[in-house]
Amino acid sequence: MAEPIIMAFICYQCGYGAADLAGTSRMQYPASVRPIRVPCTGKFLYYLRIKGIPKGADAVFVAGCKPNECAFETGNFSVEERVKMTKQILDEMGIGGDRIEMFFMSGADAGKFTEAVNEMTDRAKKLGPNPLKK
């Protein structure tokens, strides 16, 4: 089986810095991750409607700022609630709420970024391919 496709919606302020540092530090993680930089993870619901699981990603994670570090003040808290709701919806649809997760990190958390990628890859392998994949 090919590596599962993981979409990572990463905050420009924090998650992107962690992903960039992971790359420049030559940290190892599956190449099947698709990082999508967003201005703030608080806008995640919009991106989820047009990308991610509906488009066939096997798993999705959101990498947002740590609590009280969001440049937009509450973006990371609002997305945390949206991720919880999305998990419930995916469970009700029979797709699996474990296909989505929220991770908090700073721009210096390269290790946290690679752990998130690896965790979501392992989850996607256990869950199998996204049933919405064409």
From Swiss-Prot:
Q: Which NCBIfam families match?
A: F420_non_VhuD
State the coiled-coil residue ranges.
none
- Keywords per UniProt: 2Fe-2S, Electron transport, Iron, Iron-sulfur, Metal-binding, Oxidoreductase, Transport
| Enzyme class, spelled out | oxidoreductase
Tell me which domain of life the UniProt entry assigns to the organism this sequence originates from: Archaea
| Similarity field | Belongs to the MvhD/VhuD family.
User: Could you say which EC number(s) this protein's record lists?
Assistant: 1.12.99.-
InterPro entries referenced in this protein's UniProt entry, alphabetically: MvhD/FlpD (IPR003813)
Q: How does it assemble?
A: The F420-non-reducing hydrogenase vhu is composed of four subunits; VhuA, VhuD, VhuG and VhuU.
Keyword match Iron? yes
Q: What is this protein called?
A: F420-non-reducing hydrogenase vhu iron-sulfur subunit D
Q: Which GO terms fall under molecular function for this chain's record? A: 2 iron, 2 sulfur cluster binding; metal ion binding; oxidoreductase activity
Pfam families named in the record: FlpD
The answer, when asked if Lipoprotein is one of the entry's keywords, is no
Manner of cofactor binding, per the entry note: Binds 1 [2Fe-2S] cluster.
Tell me which cofactor or cofactors this protein depends on. Answer: [2Fe-2S] cluster
